[in-house]
Each structure stands twice: as structure tokens, then as C-alpha cells.
Amino acid sequence: IILSFVAITVFQNFLPGLLYGQGFAVSNLLYSAYMGDAGIFGLPLGIAANIVIVFLIFGALMERAGASRWFMEMALALTGWSRGGPAKAAVVASAMFGSISGSPSGNSATTGVFTIPMMKKIGYTPAFAAAVEAVASTGGIILPPVMGAIAFIMAEWINTTYTAIVIAATVPAILYFLIVFVSVHLQARKDGIEALPRSELPKFWPVFIRGWYYLMPIGVLIYFLVIKTFPPGIAGIYTCAAVFATSFLAPREFWLTPARLVQAFDEGVRRWITVAAITAAVGIMIGALELSGVGIKVSRFIVDLAGGDLTMTLILVGLVSLIVGMGLDATPAYITLATLMAPALIQLDVPPMAAHLFVIYWGLASFYTPPTCIAVF
């Protein structure tokens, strides 16, 4: 995608129709990409360096501190008694941990180890169990209050507050998981899957008391973001410190000792390197789009193709967002779509926040949509 936009910028004067322009020398493109405000060192990489890395480390710390296992036990205690309970527990656990981890595919690999065998054990088919895990893990990215790192990136991008984004995203997230719950329940009725005996389920209060401290870092995050209105990066640092401190309330095997801290930081930074490389490359794309004007032309083309009709524009933007999101992780997918697709909706007087939420919802759908559906792998 990025190389195609670079080629378009350089050879624009040889291209027909929508892509035609004056064309720019490679030296101009390199200058724009390296020195321009919208280039490699522009907003995408700046957000990755200041915000995303902190929350990727936060997710890795929570994972090393045993949070994923506790979320799974809590989810079982809350929903395991109902028909198809383990599948509903998988939805709850994957949603809770997916919101923290920020990576649908990574979350599927982490929680899926527990949830998929559990769903298969009570009678769900392997394909359905994997599908439930993939959909729930992806939905964690749109679930407040954390929403991976997307809420913080969006706040910077459209110049609004984190609180406003959380409020706007709450109802769609509830509807998303309500539909997943209903699907799981109906499939359980269809397959004749009964509820697990309560004797086989963990008790709510013993489980809650055993791991209530895993909720404290999330409370710290909300406090510093909403009440103290700290920048997301600073709030994330305090949250990481809270994870470290509360880990010593967990069983000794989950204490964040120096060795486990190194492992968590290593894992978080490894995830960030991928994001940083992609966001830097996206910066090159944004620089090329700014130089060539193709981004504006694409937005206008979509609106013109839809005849200025908002419904048709939403359909076109949704389809393109689904295709563009394939193969990208959540954060790079959002940045790419915010650059290419959101302006088309804003041009039709759709509020910026609604436009950005719309494109990321459709972009994330690519995680469980063939042919790529990387959360399924």
C-alpha cells in the first residue's frame, strides 16, 4: 500500500484520471517524508513513541502478573452457570484482556489457550470455538475504558478528550458483545449444550478476593486520565507502576521480579518495534498523500461515486476500510484508515469522532473476515 502511494507521487504526471498530477522528484518525496510535519517523524510515529509503547508494556506486565488467568476465572464464575457458559466466559475474558493487550491476534493466542479447549470440551465445534475467541478478542479493542491504545491515538488525532471517546464508544461496544452473547447462546441451544454444574465452577467471591488487585491498575489509569487529566503516556507510566506494585499481592509465581520485568519489557518492546516500523512507514504514506493530494482526491472520489448520499458513502467507506485493514494490526490499521477514509465522511458533515469510530470498526472486522482473518490464526 505504502509503496503504491510512493510510486503514485513520483509518477503522477503519467497516470490517468483520479491519480493524475504534476508528479514529484524522489528528492522532494524524501524531503517531505524526512523533514515534513506529516512524514516519518510525524503524528503516527510520535504517538507510537509516546503512547503506544507504554500501553503495550502495560499489557505485557498484566499478562506476566497473571491477569489473563484471573480474568478467565472471573468470567467463568460470572457466566459459567448459564447455557453455553464457558463460551460466554470466553467472550468476557477475551474482551477484558483484549482491551488491555491492544492486539486481537496476540490476545487470541493468550486467552485462546484456555478458552478454546474449554468450549470444545462442552460440545462446541472447533471452528465455532475459534470463531468466538477471534471475534471476542477483536472486540476488546473497542471496549472502554482502555480500548488498546486506539482511544488515546484518536484523542490526539481529532483533538478531543479521552473521556469523550470512551463515552461515545460505550454503547457500540455493549451492542457488539450483546450480539456475540446472543449468538453463543443460540448456538448452544441448537447443539443441545447445557450449563455446567455449579459444583464444577469457581465461586465468584473467592475468585474476586484472590485477584481483586488486578482491577487496581485500571482504576489508576482512569483516575489519572479522567480526574487528573494527565497525558495518556504519563498516565500509562503510573499504571505500569501500579501493576508492578500490585503484583506482589499475587501468588509468588506472578511477582514481577527483575527477571519477569525484563521479560515483560522485552515482550512489550518487541510488539512496539513492529508498530513503530509500520507507523513510520505510514508516515511516509501520509507525506506522499500530502505532497500529491491523492488523499483528498480519494475522499472526493468516494463521495462523488456515492452521489453525495451518506448511506452509499458509508457502505463504500466500510468496504474499503475492511479491505485496507486486512493484514494490519489494530493501531496501524486505524492510522491508515484515519488518513484515507475518515475525511470522506467528514466531508459529508459526519462528526469527526463518529467518522473515526466508523472506520476503525470496519477495519477491525478484517481480523475475523476471510481471506486474512489474522485473529483466527
Where are these regions (language model features)?
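Membrane-interfacial loop-to-helix junctions in multi-pass transporters
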Residues: 38-51, 77-90, 122-128, 209-215, ...
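Hydrophobic transmembrane alpha-helical segments of multi-pass transport and channel proteins
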Residues: 142, 161, 173-178, 232, ...
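Core transmembrane alpha-helical segments of multi-pass membrane transporters/permeases
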Residues: 5-26, 30-69, 233, 237, ...
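Membrane-water interface of transmembrane alpha-helices in multipass transporters/channels
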Residues: 160-167, 233-237, 294, 312, ...
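Hydrophobic transmembrane alpha-helices that form the pore/transport pathway of multi-pass ion
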Residues: 72-140, 150, 159, 330-365, ...
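Long, contiguous bundles of hydrophobic transmembrane helices that form the permeation core
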Residues: 1, 167-271, 374-377
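Transmembrane helix-loop boundary segments of multi-pass membrane transporters
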Residues: 151-152, 156-175, 232-234, 358-364
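Hydrophobic core segments of alpha-helical transmembrane domains in multi-pass membrane transport
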Residues: 4-13, 51-61, 94-98, 156, ...
